[in-house]
From Swiss-Prot:
Keywords: DNA-directed RNA polymerase, Nucleotidyltransferase, Transcription, Transferase. Its EC number is 2.7.7.6. GO terms for biological process: DNA-templated transcription. This is DNA-directed RNA polymerase subunit omega. GO terms for cellular component: DNA-directed RNA polymerase complex. It is an enzyme of class 2 (transferase). Signal peptide: none annotated. InterPro entries: DNA-dir_RNA_pol_omega (IPR003716), Pol_omega/Rpo6/RPB6 (IPR006110), RPB6/omega-like_sf (IPR036161). It comes from Acinetobacter baumannii (strain ATCC 17978 / DSM 105126 / CIP 53.77 / LMG 1025 / NCDC KC755 / 5377).
Amino acid sequence: MARVTVEDCLDHVDNRFELVLVASKRARQLARQGMEPTVEWDNDKPTVVALREIAVGHVTKEILKQREQDYQTSSLDLALSTNSLNLEGFSF
């Protein structure tokens, strides 16, 4: 599929607003969580791949029920590890 149209995606999602939610969640999964795409990547950005997956029916609104990975935990771990540095003499 060379181009993805909104109409192609709306065959599988109820409305444009839900399409935005589904596509953004799937794009985040592809970009940040390392999920494997169900269509060929073709050097596209994650948002384009997400829309292509929706257009062919591989991704549906059921994705909205999935829980996202907690990135705050990893940020907290990072903050705790930097806290172990010697910061004497600095005021916070």
